[in-house]
Amino acid sequence: MLDDTKRHPELRAQVETVLEQVTPLVRETTRLELPSVVNFRLITPEQWQADSAADLSSHVQRFRTRKPRWQAPVINLIERVNLAKFHQVAPLLGGVLVMGATAAGPSDQSTTMLVPEALRYSGVLSRPEYLAQLIAHELTHHLQNLATRHREVWADEKASAIVRSGSIKFLEEGHAYWVDQEVTRLLFGAAHDIGDLSKSTLSDVYRKADADPRIVKMRSGPDLYKEGLALVSPAMEAVGAANLNRVWTDLALLPTRREVKHPVLWVARLERRLSTAATGAPRSVG
């Protein structure tokens, strides 16, 4: 746990304590392997913006290198458009609205970036349950990334999701949301969700940023968290965490966009594939 800002020793200690509390519960709930090192950083809003823009560009660069050179002009245009959109809202996100973000590195490690100002404005620090939810959520992304072994095929799928509509973020965020609810239930006797906070309890800074037309427009699309949770919850109930974890190493099990809209279809396909694998019957292609 690093405090790159050098200004928040108490918050650093608080996050370290919560990490110690939630780590075994996240491991137990996900049935996934823990990384050998878990990196959490407290950073400034400016550093968050710079790191997030660099992460976005790295995904596009990976996608670009996998495609024919004749597609480069279109991909370059998409990158410029995405970066322009990001920079329009970045000060509102990194400094106010985004409580935490996790990026996969080139090794088997990931890094979670936390902005102290955003934690305060969003109400995360108002109750220990909300900080525990956030840390459990972001830690789950570390385990997801390790489960894929940061393999090129998975990274390619994530990169391509930037330039076309994909389902991978619904899976990742829905899974992490499901886990953070389970972890807070284990810790506090009931699930806790920062999203349930009344807007009247949020800071004026947060409410103003949240009402900004650019943010309202950005949020007019699909809700990664709610739709993702609606996707993952029935799958967990049907096949269990250990079986669901096969999706991290088998891209054929990834939900389609249609299955995100209709989770029962994904659950049925998972059950068929798992049943086929269990009986040793030949697996169909496609």
Language model feature labels by segment:
Residues 55-132, 139-146:
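Active-site scaffold of zinc-dependent metalloenzymes
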Residues 17-20, 137, 170-174, 226, ...:
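A structural signal for well-ordered alpha-helical segments within the folded catalytic domains
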Residues 12, 128, 132, 169, ...:
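Solvent-exposed, acidic/flexible segments
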Residues 139, 143, 147, 179, ...:
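Generic structural signal for hydrophobic core residues of well-folded globular domains
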Residues 1-75, 144, 263-286:
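N-terminal low-structure segments adjacent to metalloprotease catalytic domains
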Residues 186-286:
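Pan-zinc metallopeptidase signature
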Residues 121-125, 157-165, 209-218:
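Acidic/His metal-coordination segments adjacent to aromatic residues that form catalytic metal sites
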Residues 130, 134, 145-196:
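Post-HExxH zinc-binding segment in Zn-dependent metallohydrolases
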